[in-house]
Curated annotation (Swiss-Prot):
The gene is pdxJ. The lineage of its organism: Bacteria, Pseudomonadati, Pseudomonadota, Gammaproteobacteria, Enterobacterales. This is Pyridoxine 5'-phosphate synthase. It catalyses: 3-amino-2-oxopropyl phosphate + 1-deoxy-D-xylulose 5-phosphate = pyridoxine 5'-phosphate + phosphate + 2 H2O + H(+). Catalyzes the complicated ring closure reaction between the two acyclic compounds 1-deoxy-D-xylulose-5-phosphate (DXP) and 3-amino-2-oxopropyl phosphate (1-amino-acetone-3-phosphate or AAP) to form pyridoxine 5'-phosphate (PNP) and inorganic phosphate. GO terms for molecular function: pyridoxine 5'-phosphate synthase activity.
Length: 243
């Protein structure tokens, strides 16, 4: 059974800050509190439109984090150049559309193998570990292994958005099967998107899961309970799921 880690996404601290054009709340301070509460890493998505996290945030976080930085980004020349210069510990390559509210699905790695292979190599040559954000699909998982990514992050949005218990159980089984298949190919398996305090335990209980990246639910809970308690409670639920 893989060690289970929690990556806390702090994008929406920046969303709150940018809503008023102020210097607060500060994502760097939020990252420090999350680390104190047990976060194993900090995830930020530097979007092309800079709607929340900024280049300055990325630079300061890379210099100040005690744990690991996971930079989510689109596969563009601009973002690859920023990553190579900043050298986060991890980069998670994601699809990105300007009009979307949040990432809506996984990368089509199988349909753009050469582009993904080049991106993975460029990042790896800079000493950055790469994960590909993909759906729980065997063809995409095979393609991820073929292009040289050591990690995948399984998109859990369909599981999180399931309208019935039966639909959620079906999505859970699909994710579990995908995690087993990916592990058989030598990939390490992360997961994220839409995970909350109500649905995280079933995903955390999947033996092959290495890390869960969770943001919106934690920041939403933090508004009510405080960020430290929110992170600590999420970590407790994850570890409890492992017995």
């Amino acid at each position: 059974m893989a060690e289970l880690l929690l990556g806390v996404n702090i994008d929406h601290i920046a969303t709150l800050r940018n809503a008023r054009g102020t210097a607060y709340p500060d994502p760097v301070q939020a990252a420090f509190i999350a680390e104190q509460a047990g976060a194993d890493g900090i995830t930020v998505h530097l979007r092309e439109d800079r709607r929340h996290i900024t280049d300055r945030d990325v630079c300061i976080l890379r210099q100040t984090l005690d744990t690991r930085m996971n930079l989510e980004m689109a596969v563009t020349e601009e973002m690859l150049a920023i990553a190579v210069e900043t050298k986060p510990h991890f980069c998670c390559l994601v699809p990105e559309k300007r009009q979307e509210v949040t990432t809506e699905g996984g990368l089509d790695v199988a349909g753009q193998r050469e582009k993904m292979r080049d991106a993975c190599k460029r990042l790896a040559d800079a000493g950055i570990q790469v994960s590909l954000f993909i759906d729980a699909d065997e063809d995409q998982i095979k393609a991820a292994a073929e292009v040289g990514a050591p990690f995948i992050e399984i998109h859990t949005g369909c599981y999180a958005d399931a309208k019935t218990d039966a639909e959620q159980a079906q999505e859970l089984a699909r994710i579990a099967k995908a995690a087993t298949f990916a592990t058989s190919l030598g990939l390490k398996v992360n997961a994220g998107h839409g995970l909350t305090y109500h649905n995280v335990k079933a995903i955390a209980a999947i033996p092959e899961m290495h890390e869960l990246n969770i943001g919106h639910a934690i920041i939403g809970r933090a508004v009510m309970t405080g960020l430290k308690d929110a992170v600590a409670e999420m970590k407790r639920l994850m570890l409890e799921a492992r017995g």
